Amino acid sequence: CAKKREWCAKTEDCCCPMKCIYAWYNEQSSCQTTFSGMFKKC
């Protein structure tokens, strides 16, 4: 996983749950992933 503070812009960048959630919380993410998709292996 990349650092959680890195920008999460594309769906393929969001396979690490905490990274995507952290980015979304800080309004840095527009990625639309399902909860099951968030846990897929990178």
UniProtKB/Swiss-Prot annotation:
Its main location: secreted. Keywords: Disulfide bond, Ion channel impairing toxin, Knottin, Neurotoxin, Secreted, Toxin, Voltage-gated sodium channel impairing toxin. It is found in: Secreted. GO terms for cellular component: extracellular region. Disulfide bonds join C1-C15, C8-C20, C14-C31, C16-C42. GO terms for molecular function: sodium channel inhibitor activity; toxin activity. It comes from the Eukaryota. This is Delta-actinopoditoxin-Mb1a. It comes from Missulena bradleyi. The lineage of its organism: Eukaryota, Metazoa, Ecdysozoa, Arthropoda, Chelicerata.
